[in-house]
């Protein structure tokens, strides 16, 4: 395709047009600031130092280490000793000034203190132990005025900002996340930057904002900031790890940091010259040496002179200004929460479905209750379920609080709203939403046949609603004052467990132990249950059921000599007052009905205030940032205090002189040359809505070649990489993938390496363990274990990871830094020795320029050694791009604009584009040039490519390669997995156990949960006697042991999901091990910890309650409880496996356990259950557990009734009680006994004679 010369001339002025557009849009945005806020003016900082927690390295906090720390805390000597917390200096004596309208670039390798400097200048100091020095602002007050037309200005500004950031097309699209599909990663990054930009701040601090953006988009964003900073007279501070010459030219000043030391601060134009001036003998080697040279320079003296604060200055206050008043912040937050509810349809549809299913299940289970005494227990059981649903629903609040916390902290820093306004807005949004949730439960009320009057219905509704609101803010308050979800599970679980126990149903208030009965007064569930029980039963009248009439039979026709064997009955009267029953059985008083609603309202107000205060106190945790945790410390003869000052040798771009192609002693482990040709032809990927992500993309990878995949954000780079690696699972894919001209073998997954952009690792594994697992499971079984381990050590040396080989990978900020994690990611794939090719997705993203070049040079060495590499890359420098052999360049829509060799100094591809557009300048980065010219939407680069001679040449070469067919599996095994199944299971189970062992919070949390819940059960039913109430207590104590299940599930599910996500994201795609290996290993590793927790709980519970101590009965009870504990673990993992996130799984846990517990026996005894549901008992594990352990506990237990439990009836004249009731006791279904058979007037009857009779009422078998 011939492009006219005029077109190429027009392309040369496109930059000027784009610059004019930016200036116009920025001008409009600045002009709309009718109510300009107060400006800080010049920012001055003098001798600014920051001290952080920790010393940079620690032992990993595994179970033995945690126990050791607990023992030390238990020592009285530890109580009085006041050893200072370990600390280290993160930033040292930073001095300088940022004038109005200036931009300061902060440069340094990761860990040098760039982020710390930005936070210190922005006055965000709560994360650090201490800060020293001062930050001032010159007083330059610009008083704000009210905007009379705020709504129209907001809409205008929105459109302006969307155009500035290139987000017009994404304006109405859901942002999404790792689990919810939305906009692209680059667009998501721009949304975050736009959010901060819209604050109209006087001081902007951006920490590596161009990470994840292509160079063209990055330069545009920096241009926008340059224009806005100049026009609005604000100040901008920004750290950049990979800054091009074009980017540097936009800044006024540069700050260079090295391990917290200032190496340079001054004008950007002098930054290159100053290091050269410092290279005088002796040459500075350590960061402190460079700092000393800087202090001797004229630039330091200029910074000190500028930092001498004039008279009209004041200390920089903590940020306090908000654009909106507090009440308006509450309103905006409330509206936002409504929008979240309405747009997150999946969550509320699932919640509504689950609640309605629960309501229908319970409604059919307890349906059509009649006004007879036999239905009183089931009616109260149904009321208890209404309360239980509220408790389980409210307990899920704690998980959602942690999900929202990062967003809240970010927007708090941006001064969008006070955290207290967010809290109150969330509570106000809950007011109608919780009511809707209760309305889902309406089938319960109408199907069960609760009292059908408006007064009773709305009283039931109000009681449940107010109780739900109180419980919700109560559990939310726990989350607000807890640092992590793992630690919040303990108080949430214990509180839920205690609240359920003391609802008043399991153990009635008259039967509560004196020392624990006070708990019910702090239990909102108790107040709900008492009110709805009084509302439903208190003013009713119930006819005595035939089974409750004593004595009964053909002989007994006169009710004068009969009674109803139910609490609250009157001798000679077979009609029972609901008020007397509820008072005698539960101790509930009718006058408390509305009082309880008021108490729950007070609970709601109190904890709402507490949540508001707690959110106002939200801080980023003062963690030991940038700390590396070791399995064992690599230093043995150096004290901790000394280690903080030891300078580590600098990491150079040279790989330690290790030559992967040399014939040294590691020759046996070096990379074998790859002889496979990987090709793809006419690949297209189309979504269901017709959108094309890839469009007829063709190409190939020659053995030992290194190919770059580039394009603008949203061009489809990662999509193409995932497609080539067979990791795409959306849309319709057409075209072909070939290895040596043949279809891909099933072993393709494990014979290729894939380095993810996000560095997916199990945080508890050490570097060496991660590489060893990859080598053991992905290399063929024919290779000995010794050879695999030797190869791992070679890779560790190759990647210069000897000093961190035994370090736990951790998470960013509490583990390895970004560059080291990237090396680990590459090492994991190299340990598997992929013999086909190696995919890398953005391996240099987030790294500084030196580290990025080091990674690319490493890839070059691997390629030279025979490894085929395909790599996506966003912002390569000219040095980096020249390391590649070929380039595949995409534009939005997944269309190809070029595929072929780069040529020496990229001359081949530059000459190609220069035929159709402006030439590349001598000083211009070729990568920036290619992205800039290909982003011109006025030129149809795809059509130019299709009609170019280069395209025809590549097509001919592709067809030649496809016709040179060779069996791709001939050079290696075509098995999907490299090693046998049992070896997979052993290796993965060992890793899972180590993962648990190094998470002391999880293991000790499980122990603590079982200790506290066992103690609560044991103390609540302490040393029960043989009377009727305590016999009931024996049965319900067993049921209380069952309600530990939801609590333990909340703790098990996050651990399972962490392992599952690791498997699905990387190991499953790479065919490391079979999916069933994961599920079995996850269950196997849970067993010992589950059995330990079960043992602790059972010992505390069984003997405190006073069950049988004999070995046969105690042994049976122990076996049954351990089996129940295993069932809990397996059910929790099943629930977690069915849901994508921890929050979704924990929300579903309440529903799952409600269904499971419904058919356990005591809550809905089989004799009273409708026939349509009785089959469910045959498949209910909890029914067998309670039946077995209940029968074991109650068999041959003689029951004696105390005074209040005795039922009275009169005997006829001239007859003793025994003779009169003889016919009744001869009946097969008769239970109980007469206490005074020889009496002739009032007969005293006990409803049950022994435990077997009592159990038969719940379990007829």
UniProtKB/Swiss-Prot annotation:
<dbReference type="InterPro" id="IPR013525">
    <property type="entry name" value="ABC2_TM"/>
</dbReference>
<comment type="function">
    <text>ABC-type transporter; part of the gene cluster that mediates the biosynthesis of talaronoid C, a fusicoccane diterpenoid with an unprecedented tricyclic 5/8/6 ring system. May be involved in resistance to the products of the cluster.</text>
</comment>
<feature type="transmembrane region" description="Helical">
    <location>
        <begin position="596"/>
        <end position="616"/>
    </location>
</feature>
<feature type="domain" description="ABC transporter 1">
    <location>
        <begin position="71"/>
        <end position="284"/>
    </location>
</feature>
<feature type="glycosylation site" description="N-linked (GlcNAc...) asparagine">
    <location>
        <position position="620"/>
    </location>
</feature>
<feature type="binding site">
    <location>
        <begin position="711"/>
        <end position="718"/>
    </location>
    <ligand>
        <name>ATP</name>
    </ligand>
</feature>
<keyword id="KW-0677">Repeat</keyword>
<keyword id="KW-0472">Membrane</keyword>
<feature type="glycosylation site" description="N-linked (GlcNAc...) asparagine">
    <location>
        <position position="1068"/>
    </location>
</feature>
<feature type="transmembrane region" description="Helical">
    <location>
        <begin position="1080"/>
        <end position="1100"/>
    </location>
</feature>
<feature type="glycosylation site" description="N-linked (GlcNAc...) asparagine">
    <location>
        <position position="637"/>
    </location>
</feature>
<dbReference type="InterPro" id="IPR027417">
    <property type="entry name" value="P-loop_NTPase"/>
</dbReference>
<dbReference type="InterPro" id="IPR034003">
    <property type="entry name" value="ABCG_PDR_2"/>
</dbReference>
<dbReference type="InterPro" id="IPR010929">
    <property type="entry name" value="PDR_CDR_ABC"/>
</dbReference>
<keyword id="KW-0547">Nucleotide-binding</keyword>
<dbReference type="Pfam" id="PF00005">
    <property type="entry name" value="ABC_tran"/>
</dbReference>
<keyword id="KW-0813">Transport</keyword>
<feature type="domain" description="ABC transporter 2">
    <location>
        <begin position="678"/>
        <end position="918"/>
    </location>
</feature>
<feature type="glycosylation site" description="N-linked (GlcNAc...) asparagine">
    <location>
        <position position="1226"/>
    </location>
</feature>
<dbReference type="InterPro" id="IPR003593">
    <property type="entry name" value="AAA+_ATPase"/>
</dbReference>
<feature type="transmembrane region" description="Helical">
    <location>
        <begin position="455"/>
        <end position="475"/>
    </location>
</feature>
<dbReference type="GO" id="GO:0005524">
    <property type="term" value="F:ATP binding"/>
</dbReference>
<dbReference type="GO" id="GO:0016887">
    <property type="term" value="F:ATP hydrolysis activity"/>
</dbReference>
<protein>
    <recommendedName>
        <fullName>ABC-type transporter tndA</fullName>
    </recommendedName>
</protein>
<dbReference type="Pfam" id="PF06422">
    <property type="entry name" value="PDR_CDR"/>
</dbReference>
<feature type="transmembrane region" description="Helical">
    <location>
        <begin position="1038"/>
        <end position="1058"/>
    </location>
</feature>
<keyword id="KW-0812">Transmembrane</keyword>
<keyword id="KW-1133">Transmembrane helix</keyword>
<dbReference type="Pfam" id="PF19055">
    <property type="entry name" value="ABC2_membrane_7"/>
</dbReference>
<keyword id="KW-0325">Glycoprotein</keyword>
<feature type="transmembrane region" description="Helical">
    <location>
        <begin position="1114"/>
        <end position="1134"/>
    </location>
</feature>
<feature type="glycosylation site" description="N-linked (GlcNAc...) asparagine">
    <location>
        <position position="575"/>
    </location>
</feature>
<dbReference type="Pfam" id="PF01061">
    <property type="entry name" value="ABC2_membrane"/>
</dbReference>
<feature type="glycosylation site" description="N-linked (GlcNAc...) asparagine">
    <location>
        <position position="10"/>
    </location>
</feature>
<keyword id="KW-1003">Cell membrane</keyword>
<dbReference type="InterPro" id="IPR003439">
    <property type="entry name" value="ABC_transporter-like_ATP-bd"/>
</dbReference>
<comment type="similarity">
    <text>Belongs to the ABC transporter superfamily. ABCG family. PDR (TC 3.A.1.205) subfamily.</text>
</comment>
<dbReference type="GO" id="GO:0140359">
    <property type="term" value="F:ABC-type transporter activity"/>
</dbReference>
<keyword id="KW-0067">ATP-binding</keyword>
<feature type="transmembrane region" description="Helical">
    <location>
        <begin position="488"/>
        <end position="508"/>
    </location>
</feature>
<feature type="glycosylation site" description="N-linked (GlcNAc...) asparagine">
    <location>
        <position position="557"/>
    </location>
</feature>
<dbReference type="GO" id="GO:0005886">
    <property type="term" value="C:plasma membrane"/>
</dbReference>
């Amino acid at each position: 395709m011939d492009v006219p010369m005029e077109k190429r001339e027009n392309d040369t002025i496109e930059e000027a047009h784009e610059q004019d557009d930016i200036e116009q849009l920025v001008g409009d945005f600045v002009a709309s600031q009718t109510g300009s806020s107060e400006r800080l003016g010049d920012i001055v900082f003098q001798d600014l130092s920051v001290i952080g927690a920790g010393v940079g390295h620690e032992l990993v906090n595994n179970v033995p280490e945690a126990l050791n720390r607990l023992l030390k805390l238990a020592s009285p000597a530890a109580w009085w000793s006041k050893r200072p917390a370990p600390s280290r200096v993160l930033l040292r004596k930073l001095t300088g000034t940022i004038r109005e309208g200036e931009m300061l670039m902060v440069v340094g390798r990761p860990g040098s203190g760039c982020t710390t400097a930005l936070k210190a200048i922005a006055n965000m100091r709560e994360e650090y132990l201490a800060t020293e020095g001062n930050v001032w602002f010159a007083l330059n007050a610009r008083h704000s005025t009210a905007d009379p037309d705020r709504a129209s200005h907001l809409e205008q500004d929105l459109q302006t900002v969307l155009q500035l950031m290139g987000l017009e097309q994404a304006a109405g699209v859901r942002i999404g996340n790792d689990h919810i599909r939305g906009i692209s990663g680059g667009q998501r990054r721009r949304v975050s930057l736009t959010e901060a930009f819209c604050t109209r701040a006087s001081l902007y601090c951006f920490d590596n904002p161009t990470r994840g953006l292509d160079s063209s988009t990055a330069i545009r964003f920096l241009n926008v900031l340059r224009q806005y900073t100049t026009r609005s007279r604000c100040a901008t501070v920004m750290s950049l790890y990979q800054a091009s010459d074009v980017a540097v030219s936009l800044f006024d000043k540069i700050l260079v940091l090295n391990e917290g030391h200032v190496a340079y601060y001054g004008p950007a134009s002098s930054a290159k010259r100053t290091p050269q001036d410092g290279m005088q003998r002796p040459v500075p080697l350590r960061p402190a040496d460079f700092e000393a040279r800087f202090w001797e320079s004229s630039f330091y003296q200029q910074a000190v002179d500028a930092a001498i604060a004039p008279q009209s200055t004041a200390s920089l206050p903590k940020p306090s200004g908000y654009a909106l008043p507090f009440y308006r912040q509450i309103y905006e937050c409330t509206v936002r929460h409504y929008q979240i509810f309405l747009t997150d349809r999946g969550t509320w549809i699932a919640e509504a479905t689950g609640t309605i299913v629960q309501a229908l299940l319970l409604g059919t289970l307890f349906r059509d209750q009649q006004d007879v005494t036999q239905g009183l227990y089931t009616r109260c059981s149904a009321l208890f379920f209404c309360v239980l649903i509220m408790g389980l629903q409210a307990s899920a609040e704690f998980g959602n609080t942690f999900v929202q916390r990062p967003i809240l902290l970010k927007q708090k820093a941006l001064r969008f709203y006070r955290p207290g306004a967010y809290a109150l807005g969330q509570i106000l949004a809950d007011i109608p939403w919780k009511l809707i949730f209760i309305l889902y439960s309406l089938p319960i009320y109408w199907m069960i046949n609760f009292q059908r009057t408006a007064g009773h219905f709305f009283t039931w509704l109000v009681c449940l609603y107010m109780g739900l609101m109180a419980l919700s803010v109560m559990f939310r308050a726990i989350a607000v004052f807890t640092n992590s979800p793992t630690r919040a599970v303990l108080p949430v679980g214990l509180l839920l467990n205690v609240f359920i126990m003391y609802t008043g149903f399991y153990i009635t208030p008259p039967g509560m132990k004196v020392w624990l009965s006070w708990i019910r007064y702090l239990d909102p569930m108790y107040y709900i249950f008492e009110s709805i029980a009084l509302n439903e039963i208190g003013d009713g009248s119930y006819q005595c059921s035939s089974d409750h009439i004593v004595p009964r039979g053909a002989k007994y026709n006169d009710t004068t000599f009969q009674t109803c064997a139910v609490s609250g009955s009157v001798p000679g009267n077979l009609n029972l007052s609901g008020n007397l029953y509820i008072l005698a059985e539960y101790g509930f008083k009718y006058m408390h009905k509305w009082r309880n609603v008021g108490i729950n309202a007070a609970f709601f107000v109190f904890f709402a205030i507490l949540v508001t205060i707690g959110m106002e106190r939200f801080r980023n945790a003062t963690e030991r940032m940038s700390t590396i945790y070791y399995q064992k410390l690599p230093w043995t003869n150096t004290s901790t205090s000394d280690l903080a000052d030891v300078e580590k040798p600098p990491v150079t771009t040279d790989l330690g002189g290790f030559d992967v192609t040399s014939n040294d002693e590691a020759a046996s482990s070096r990379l074998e040359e790859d002889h496979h040709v990987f090709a793809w032809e006419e690949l297209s990927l189309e979504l269901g809505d017709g959108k094309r992500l890839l469009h007829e993309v063709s190409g190939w990878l020659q053995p030992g070649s290194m190919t770059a995949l580039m394009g603008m954000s949203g061009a489809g780079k990662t999509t193409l990489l995932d497609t080539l690696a067979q990791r795409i699972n959306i849309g319709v894919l057409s075209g072909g993938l070939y290895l040596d001209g043949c279809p891909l073998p099933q072993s393709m997954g494990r014979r290729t390496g894939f380095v993810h952009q996000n560095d997916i690792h199990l945080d508890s594994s050490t570097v060496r363990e991660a590489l060893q697992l990859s080598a053991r499971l992905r290399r063929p079984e024919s290779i000995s274990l010794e050879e695999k381990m030797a190869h791992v050590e070679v890779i560790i040396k190759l990647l210069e990871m000897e000093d961190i080989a035994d370090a736990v990978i951790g998470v960013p900020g509490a583990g390895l830094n970004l560059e080291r994690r990237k090396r680990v990611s590459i090492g994991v794939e190299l340990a598997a020795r992929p013999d086909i090719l190696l995919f890398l997705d953005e391996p240099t993203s987030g790294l500084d320029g030196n580290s990025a070049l080091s990674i690319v040079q490493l890839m070059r060495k691997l390629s030279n050694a025979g490894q085929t590499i395909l790599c996506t890359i966003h912002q390569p420098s000219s040095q980096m791009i020249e390391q590649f052999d070929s380039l595949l360049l995409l534009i939005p829509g997944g269309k190809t604009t070029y595929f072929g060799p780069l040529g020496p100094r990229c001359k081949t591809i530059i000459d190609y584009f220069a035929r159709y557009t402006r030439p590349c300048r001598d000083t211009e980065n070729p990568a920036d040039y290619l992205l800039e010219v290909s982003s011109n939407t006025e030129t149809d680069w795809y059509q130019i490519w299709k009609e170019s001679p280069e395209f025809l040449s590549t097509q001919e070469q592709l067809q030649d390669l496809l016709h040179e067919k060779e069996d791709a599996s001939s050079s290696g095994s075509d098995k999907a997995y490299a090693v046998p199944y049992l070896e997979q299971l052993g290796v993965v189970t060992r890793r899972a156990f180590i993962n648990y062992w190094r998470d002391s919070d999880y293991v000790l949390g499980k122990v603590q949960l079982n200790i506290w819940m066992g103690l609560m059960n044991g103390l609540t039913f302490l040393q029960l006697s043989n009377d009727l109430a305590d016999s009931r207590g024996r049965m319900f104590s067993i049921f209380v042991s069952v309600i530990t299940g939801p609590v333990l599930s909340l703790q098990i599910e996050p651990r399972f999901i962490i392992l599952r996500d690791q498997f699905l994201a990387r190991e499953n795609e790479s065919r490391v091990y079979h999916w069933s290996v994961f599920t079995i290993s996850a269950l196997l590793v849970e067993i010992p910890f589950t059995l330990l927790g079960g043992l602790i709980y059972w010992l505390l519970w069984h003997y405190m309650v006073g069950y049988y101590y004999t070995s046969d009965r105690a042994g049976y009870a122990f076996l049954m409880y351990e089996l129940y504990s295993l069932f809990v673990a397996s059910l929790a993992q099943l629930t977690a496996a069915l849901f994508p996130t921890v929050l979704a799984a924990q929300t579903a846990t309440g529903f799952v356990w409600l269904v499971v517990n419904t058919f356990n026996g005591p809550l809905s005894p089989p004799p009273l259950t409708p026939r349509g549901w009785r089959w469910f008992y045959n498949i209910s594990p909890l029914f067998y557990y309670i039946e077995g352990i209940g029968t074991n506990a109650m068999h041959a237990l003689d029951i004696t009734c105390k005074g209040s439990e005795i039922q009275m009836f009169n005997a006829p004249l001239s007859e003793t009680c025994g003779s009169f009731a003889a016919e009744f006791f001869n009946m097969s279904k008769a239970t109980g006994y007469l206490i005074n058979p020889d009496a002739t007037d009032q007969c005293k009857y006990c409803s049950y004679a022994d435990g077997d009779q009592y159990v038969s009422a719940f379990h007829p078998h």
